[in-house]
Amino acid sequence: MDIKKLSSLAHCAKTRSIVSLFDQKERANDFSLSTSHLYLDYSKQNITDVELEQLIEIAEDVGLSESITGQFNGDKINNTEGRSVLHTILRAPQVIKQQILGDTLANEVEAAELQMAKVVNDVQKGILTSHTGQRFTDVLAIGIGGSYYGVKVSLSALEHYRDLALSVHVIANVDGGALEEKLKTLNFETTLVVVISKTFTTQETMLNAKAVKQWMLSCASVKDLELNNVPLIIEKQWFAVSSNIEAAKEFGINIKHILPMWDWVGGRFSIWSTVGLPLALAIGNDNFNKLKQGAYEMDVHFKSTDFKNNMPVIMALLGIWNRNALEYPTLAILPYAHSLRALPGYLQQTDMESNGKSVSKSGDKLSWLTAPVVFGQEGTNGQHAFMQLMHQSDDIIPTDFIVALKGRSQYTENHKVLVANCFAQSEALMQGKTLTQVESELEMSALSTAEISLIAPHKTMKGNTPSNTLVMDLLTPETIGSLLALYEHKIFVQGVLWQVNSFDQWGVELGKQLGTRILSAIDGAEDDLLSASSQSLIARFRARSNVTPSV
C-alpha cells in the first residue's frame, strides 16, 4: 500500500471541515449507495470524490480485483495455514458449489446441509424427541469464538422470527457461574445440546460440555438408572458440529448426530455452515435459507460491481482513509436497534481478529497500522455512556450508525424517536458546536456575562467526526444476511490493502499455551520461566481459592 500517497492526500483533509463539503449540493446523493437490502450514506465522511478516486487507484494497484476473484475461486489465500477461504460458497447455489469445490466435495456439503435441515424439521415437528419421548423446549449451544459470536448476533437480530416453542441459548465463557445460572433455567429431559468445536478439544468448550454432561447425568432419575437409560440421554439429546468425528463419538454422541465442518471455513465466518444449526433450530429452515440468500446477494454485488459503486469496497476504503491517512485509531459500531445489540461484539471479533496484525503475508514487518479498535453499544444507551467522550474529547472516533426504518414493536412513537436519535447523533458528531454558537444561545438566557464566560467553554463540541449511516427498511433474514456479508467483505478488502492474512489468528495461541502452563503451575508443577508477577499471583490463588467468601 502506498502510505506516502495516502499521507499526502490527507494533508488538506486534516484541517478541513466536513460541513464545508456539503457546499457541493448533490453530496448526499453522490456519496450514497444502495444494494438490494441496504442503503449506505457516507456523505458525512471527511473525503472528496478526488480523494476517493485516489483510494480506488491504490486498491487497483495492489490487485484487489484479482484477490476477490482468488478468494471466491478457492485460492489458498490463508497462506500461513495453507487453506482456501470459502465460507461464501456455503451461501451459493449448488451449481456454483460444484464448479468451485468439484462434485465430490459439493455433494458432501449438500448432504451436510440436508442433514442439518432434517434435524431442524424433526425437532420442530416433534419427530426427534428426548430420551423420555418429550418434545424439546430448549437448545443449549456450547462453543466459543466464531461458533459463539455468529450464532449470538444472528439469534438476537432475528429474534422476531424465532420459534416460540423452542428457546435457544448459547454458552461460551469458561466461567462456571455463567453456566450454572443457565442450567438453573433448563429441564434436562427437554434440553437438546449442540457442542460446536472443529477439533473437539477446545478447552473452554469441552469443559462446559463435560459440565453439562455431568449435570444431565446427575439429574437422571432412579427409573433411568434402573432401565440403564443414562447413555441414551447423551445419545438422543446431544449433537456435535465438528471435524473430529472420533472424539465426538468417544464423548458419547450418536454418529448420526454429528455434523461435519471443513477447514476452509474459518470460525468467525462459520454461521453459514453447520455451525448455524442452533440458529436454524430457532428460526427454521426457510428463514435460515433466506439469511444465506441475503448474504449471497451481497456476494454477487461485491464480485460484480465496479469499485466506485461497490458497498464493501467503499466502506473498506473509508476505513483505510480514517485509519491510515487521518490516523484515527478506533471505530464505533452503533446499531440503533435492540435486536442488533450483539453486533458490536461480533464485529470486534470479526474485524480485530482478522486484521489485528503487524506483519505482511510474506512475514515482513508492516510500515503502517492495521485494524482499528472496535467498540460500540446499541442506541440510545450509548448516548448515556461513551458519547460524551465522542462529542467533547479531543479524540476523533469514526462511527458506523446502523438503523432499520421500520420497527416491529407496537410502540411506533418509540421507534420514531429511536430513528431520530440515530440521525441526530450523526449530525451532531459532524456539526459540533462552536464557542460563538454557545455564547449566542446563552445570551438569550438570564445569565450574566461572567457566568456565560464560565459556562460556554464547557458546552462546546468539536464536531468534524466522520460517520457512515447504514439503513435497512426492516430487520429480516435477508437484510441481516446482507449486513453480515457486507462487513465480511469490507474486512477482507482492508486485509488485502494492508497486505495481511485476514484468516489466521496466531495471537490467540500464545495465551492458550501459557494458560496450559499456568494451570499446571496452579496444580503444583514448578515453572521458573514464568515471571515473578505470575508466580506470585499463582501462589495467591492457591492459598486463597478455597477460602469461604464472607458474603
From Swiss-Prot:
Protein name per UniProt: Glucose-6-phosphate isomerase 2
Catalytic activity, as annotated: alpha-D-glucose 6-phosphate = beta-D-fructose 6-phosphate
UniProt EC number: 5.3.1.9
Enzyme type, top EC level: isomerase
InterPro entries named in the record: G6P_Isomerase, G6P_Isomerase_C, Phosphoglucose_isomerase_CS, SIS_dom_sf, SIS_PGI_1, SIS_PGI_2
Keyword Cytoplasm belongs to the record: yes
CDD domains: SIS_PGI_1 (cd05015), SIS_PGI_2 (cd05016)
PROSITE patterns recorded: P_GLUCOSE_ISOMERASE_1, P_GLUCOSE_ISOMERASE_2, P_GLUCOSE_ISOMERASE_3
Disulfide pairings: none
